[in-house]
Amino acid sequence: MSDVAAFTAYPVIAIDGPTASGKGTVAHQIADLLGFHYLDSGSLYRLVAFVSIRENIDDHDVNSLVRIASELDVRFKADHIWLKGEDVSLALRHESVGNQASAIAVHGPVREALRARQRAFLEAPGLVADGRDMGTVIFPEAVLKVFLTASVQARAERRYKQLIAKGFSATVESLSRDLEARDLRDRTRSVAPLRPAEAARLLDSSDMSVDEVVAQVLDWYRQVQGVKAR
């Protein structure tokens, strides 16, 4: 099936937003509730970052990074990510990997190398995709585009709780600085900068629970599908 036909046949919900905005948790829950496939696009960049760190490759060595992106032997199963048969799920959550991924994501050739892999996730009955450019670049014809954000303080506190729960050491202050730096890099990069897609629904989750955000996105999706059905 062609990309155009797939877009017509299978609905896509694209959820974009900055680091630690909660988009991954929300997207995963919505995919489960709808029975859709789920794409965590950030994990692909983290995988490239993880391999580059392991192979001691500089984040400016674009040719080597493209090679890594093109050769990723990855498998997603439940909440686990397997790289060449190795469960790297926990390792990918480390802040050093996230910072490297953000630096790598500025390179157009790397993004292009991962483009086809991301689009391949679009299968029946539908897809929920989260990332930085799902609604603007990868799935521009998504039936629902959401830009999910939150204050730096709220995001730093969420990230802190996640890292501590996984056994990593961190402070809210250092995480806030990292988030501000990554936000700036994501917004100002020349290729696919972080921004709301045209017609995206904007949602600030600073003072919302995960359940409240999920309910809002599902309500928007039902509205969109209702409009399509008429």
Curated annotation (Swiss-Prot):
Keywords: ATP-binding, Cytoplasm, Kinase, Nucleotide-binding, Transferase. One of its GO terms (molecular function) is CMP kinase activity. CDD domains: CMPK. It is an enzyme of class 2 (transferase). The keyword Cytoplasm applies. InterPro entries: Cytidylate_kin (IPR003136), Cytidylate_kinase_dom (IPR011994), P-loop_NTPase (IPR027417). Its EC number is 2.7.4.25. It is found in: Cytoplasm. It catalyses: CMP + ATP = CDP + ADP; dCMP + ATP = dCDP + ADP. Gene3D superfamilies: P-loop containing nucleotide triphosphate hydrolases. GO terms for cellular component: cytosol. Belongs to the cytidylate kinase family. Type 1 subfamily. HAMAP family: Cytidyl_kinase_type1. This is Cytidylate kinase. It comes from Ralstonia nicotianae (strain ATCC BAA-1114 / GMI1000).
